[in-house]
Amino acid sequence: MLERTLRVLEYNKVKEQLLEHTASSLGRDKVKHLVPSTDFEEIVEMQDTTDEAAKVIRLKGSAPLGGITDIRSNVKRAKIGSMLSPNELLDIANTMYGSRNMKRFIEDMVDNGVELPILETHVAQIVSLYDLEKKITNCIGDGGEVVDSASDKLRGIRTQIRTAESRIREKLENMTRSSNAQKMLSDSIVTIRNERYVIPVKQEYRGVYGGIVHDQSASGQTLFIEPQVIVELNNALQEARVKEKQEIERILLMLTEEVAVEADIVLSNVEVVANLDFIFAKAFYAKRIKATKPIVNNERYMDLRQARHPLIDPEVIVPNNIMLGKDFTTIVITGPNTGGKTVTLKTVGICVLMAQSGLHIPVMDESEICVFKNIFADIGDEQSIEQSLSTFSSHMVNIVDILEKADFESLVLFDELGAGTDPQEGAALAISILDEVCNRGARVVATTHYPELKAYGYNREQVINASVEFDVNTLSPTYKLLIGVPGRSNAFEISKRLGLSDRVIDQARNHISTDTNKIENMIAKLEESQKNAERDWNEAEALRKQSEKLHRELQRQIIEFNEERDERLLKAQKEGEEKVEAAKKEAEGIIQELRQLRKAQLANVKDHELIEAKSRLEGAAPELVKKQKVNVKNTSPKQQLRAGDEVKVLTFGQKGQLLEKVSDTEWSVQIGILKMKVKESNMEYINTPKQTEKKAVATVKGRDYHVSLELDLRGERFENAMARVEKYLDDAQLASYPRVSIIHGKGTGALRQGVQDYLKKHRGVKTFRYGDMGEGGLGVTVVELK
């Protein structure tokens, strides 16, 4: 991209505003080196990245980029063995914390369902160096001082220093408080000179205290003397301070070496947070100028909706719709000077430069922009004093350069094309130049005040006229771009408003050809039609926005309704589960009582005790279960139930054996030690046991109950497996098994953990352990039952 183009389109001013939104010198460095890209894929990714950061700002308001500094030179010095200062190490720790904090911030948003695929990829590159970070902050305080707790040795040395200082001060203060000292001292204070404690002694008493003179006052009347009695103490203090300095240097070298070990990771993290600072600066700038993400296409057309110049106050500037590249490839904006034509030209150019830099642009949603390999701009009066070139010559030098380089991947912007010379020749040159650039396939926006170019827009298929609206009532431009309508001078209307007589104006009209008058009238009608069409469009757009608002409100209400419904269902489900859980606990207690009855002696179990236990067990079923319909899967006409068949009683989820049919719809069923009547509709056929030698059986089933000593869960889904474990343990308890095995396999460990978590809470489990070598090892859990 030509440097001149960036300058005349004020690209650097946009960068200056962008700099204000960076959080660190790292981000500022990225902004300073920012230039527009010409790679389509890169531009799309940059726009998507800025959009993700803008989403974060919309949801969170900001991003935690504080505390990050440019530590790259410090880290490189650490790599070559230089000792870093406490503040330099603290900057490294703070930057490590900042990068770790930013990583956690983005990952938390992603975990909460916010889609940030690009930013997630960025923070995934950040490697946490928490241990090194804590080592530094444990050794260095917020003020940059090495703290006592940095090492036991340093703590001991500083204790010695404080003790020595206390003893010295105590001796000196005793000396200054004595009655004789008042006349010998200039002041009753203890001070420090050359890092040694001294007292201010009058010149004539210098020999009283002995010791060492370290300094004197400006008048020479006071000497700062270290009395002989504290010389040894001061010497000991100095020795301790030397040891302190050596220990601090050792600690700093140790920390520096640890930074050097992790230098590559630290530098990599710094590069990531520098990019994040840069990305979020673009997002904050987009918020500031009310910019949006454009749709980037590679089909060489743009559709800027309600485009604004980013450097002009959005409350002041008039937004415009600018289309180029589909129905026409060249826009010629005609009309008088000071009408806003140049602002429109610059708006097109700066929006393209910003979009190709990954910046959002000040337009409405759904605006589109294409990628140009080159952008050429001939804007403004840039006379070359050194080359003694006129305005026309200066422009022509630029135009010659443009004509040499422009092609079908170029955007060309001409301001006042052909100006600065004879109007007739200038208009002819402008037409030829436009033809040349258009024939090369470039996209062109040109401004001119030559009326000859109005006809140009009608005579060329890919060219369209445009103008900036002028309000004759206020005698000022409205800055509204009218595409398809050439500009008018409005000289007669302006003159009339300013008081020129109708007679003079009518005479002036007579000097203009009939064709010219017709053209002016036609243009006036076009302007009126354009205004009406735009008014209709604005009304339609307002209705569309209102419809979208209503649609969003309806969606919100639907979401709230669904959330409330789900919340109520969840609450009802939770209440149901609580009732079922309470029923299970009660049933377990009853089963335990029945087991105790059986252990007593089968002959001692009275009928009324069984009837009472049966009633209590049935009463333990929660209302939700009692009321729900039972889905019978097995009682098809082909399967006739017979005495001895094994069935599942659906109400209790327990296996039982049919004893005898007591009515057309009921059977007497043996469930563990209970015998009860159950309707066929409440049974599920399991199988018919093989005929074995019949034994005399009491009304209680013994250890020939059909429950396996092990439960194999391999291949089961987690939820199904947990349901089977629950049922199996109940069956095993009814069968009075002291020990059972649950085979869950090794796998990922999820099923094993789930089984053991359940066993911890089961009231019927005494203990459990992993299987021994011969029992299946970690793939099996052996359960001891109560």
Swiss-Prot record:
Q: Provide the gene name from the record.
A: mutS2
> Which SUPFAM superfamilies does UniProt cross-reference here?
DNA repair protein MutS, domain III, P-loop containing nucleoside triphosphate hydrolases, SMR domain-like
Question: Please, which domain of life does this record's source organism belong to?
Answer: Bacteria
Positions bound to ATP:
335-342
Under the heading SMART domains, the entry gives:
MUTSac, MUTSd, SMR
PANTHER family from the xrefs? Answer: OS10G0509000 PROTEIN, OS10G0509000 PROTEIN-RELATED
The catalytic activity of this protein is classed by the Enzyme Commission as 3.1.-.-, 3.6.4.-
Q: Which HAMAP family match?
A: MutS2
- Kindly indicate where the leader peptide sits in this chain: none
Q: What InterPro entries would the database entry show?
A: DNA_mismatch_repair_MutS_C (IPR000432), DNA_mismatch_repair_MutS_core (IPR007696), DNA_mismatch_repair_MutS_sf (IPR036187), MSSS (IPR046893), MutS (IPR045076), MutS2 (IPR005747), P-loop_NTPase (IPR027417), Smr_dom (IPR002625)
Keywords from the named record: ATP-binding, DNA-binding, Endonuclease, Hydrolase, Nuclease, Nucleotide-binding, RNA-binding, rRNA-binding
Give this protein's Gene Ontology molecular function annotations: ATP binding; ATP hydrolysis activity; ATP-dependent DNA damage sensor activity; endonuclease activity; mismatched DNA binding; ribosomal large subunit binding; rRNA binding
Name the enzyme's class. hydrolase
Q: What does this protein do?
A: Endonuclease that is involved in the suppression of homologous recombination and thus may have a key role in the control of bacterial genetic diversity. Acts as a ribosome collision sensor, splitting the ribosome into its 2 subunits. Detects stalled/collided 70S ribosomes which it binds and splits by an ATP-hydrolysis driven conformational change. Acts upstream of the ribosome quality control system (RQC), a ribosome-associated complex that mediates the extraction of incompletely synthesized nascent chains from stalled ribosomes and their subsequent degradation. Probably generates substrates for RQC.
Quaternary state and interactors? Homodimer. Binds to stalled ribosomes, contacting rRNA.
Report the record's Gene Ontology biological process terms: mismatch repair; negative regulation of DNA recombination; rescue of stalled ribosome
The Smr domain sits at 711-786
Regarding protein family, the annotation reads: Belongs to the DNA mismatch repair MutS family. MutS2 subfamily.
Its protein name is Endonuclease MutS2
